[in-house]
Amino acid sequence: MNIWLNMLTTTGLGAIIGGYTNHLAIKMLFRPHRPIYIGKFQVPFTPGLIPKRRDELAVQLGKMVVEHLLTPEGIGKKLTNEEFQKGLIHWAQVEVDKVITNEQSLRHMLEKWNVAHVEEEATRKIEHVITEKIHAFLAEYYTYTWEQALPHSVNEKVENAIPNVSAFILERGISFFESEEGKARLSKMIDDFFASRGTLLNLVGMFLGNVSVVDRVQPEVIKFLGQDATKQLLTDVLQKEWEKLKGRDVKELEAFVEKEMIVSSVLSAVKVEETVSKFLNQSVQQVCEPVRETIIEKVVPSAVAKGLKWGTENVESILNNLHLAEIVQQEVSTFSTERLEDLVLSITKNELKMITYLGALLGGMIGLVQGLLLLFLR
């Protein structure tokens, strides 16, 4: 009975000592959190291993992340993975579609994104661009003649239209002189003509009688205007004037119309502020609906593919510029010792328990062996 009690005692004590020793060793990894002093003498093994080496641990964790976890090769492989790319494109399509089908006004959406004074800025910038374009256009075209400035098609149309213009002018002239107003105007012109030519022609006019002269002149004027030769004459005159105009510099226009007046007229016709306001008051869905399918099916996949390609080609540079090792080091350095302990224990809790149990098992086995040795040595 005493033999079995001795063996049980040695085994139990060995298990307790082994288990507690391992448990204490594990605790000493983290505890105490601060050094303990007796007078000026620092107690050995204080603070615990991890609190004492926390800065070194932070540096090593940073190196481990950069050198073994988030490597350029690993990230590059992930970025070129076909399944990952498909998933990312699908996610991007869903998220973009949510934005472009939003029924909120474009103005409200921009304000939500903290884009302030967008209407004023857009109006100002558009007007500035239009003004700059007009000035650039005029600066270029003021160096041309009208023949150089006008498109060939316009020149052709004007030349083809000259005979029709001549015919129109003559038709209007005939209609005018056939009317009572035209006859009255012609009568006045005859009176003025005789009055300006002196006494002799005045006497002739009085002798012929005014009404008689008008009645004789009116048909001749109408007949003259209706002749083909007159039409050809007017066409030739207009053609010559058109040729003269084509040879003149566009810059001469500046003497009649100032640049700022042209700019002001264009801006007034375009109504930039009103157009921008109407555009911003539309819903995002209304604005994007005409191009929604193109954005979702073409733009998004293309943008994601190009982004991933760029990311793959520049992943090493990106990681270097991110300084991940420093980020990890700084973050770990800010952890309290308690948090660091909880973090390690949350990962290794089961394993550390098994180490404690293993210590108890080994201690128990050693105690059993000791009990057996004592039994045989008696």
From Swiss-Prot:
User: Where does it localize?
Assistant: Cell membrane
Which keywords does this Swiss-Prot/TrEMBL entry list? Cell membrane, Membrane, Transmembrane, Transmembrane helix
InterPro entries for this protein = DUF445, UCP032178
Entry's Pfam families? Answer: DUF445
Which GO terms of the cellular component aspect does the record hold? plasma membrane
Keyword Amino-acid biosynthesis among record annotations: no
> Is the Ribonucleoprotein keyword given for this protein?
no
**Where do transmembrane segments lie in this chain?**
357-377
Please give the PANTHER family that the UniProt record associates with this protein. Answer: UPF0754 MEMBRANE PROTEIN YHEB
What family name appears in the similarity comment?
A: Belongs to the UPF0754 family.
> What protein is this chain from?
UPF0754 membrane protein BC_0879
Question: Which organism was this protein described from?
Answer: Bacillus cereus (strain ATCC 14579 / DSM 31 / CCUG 7414 / JCM 2152 / NBRC 15305 / NCIMB 9373 / NCTC 2599 / NRRL B-3711)
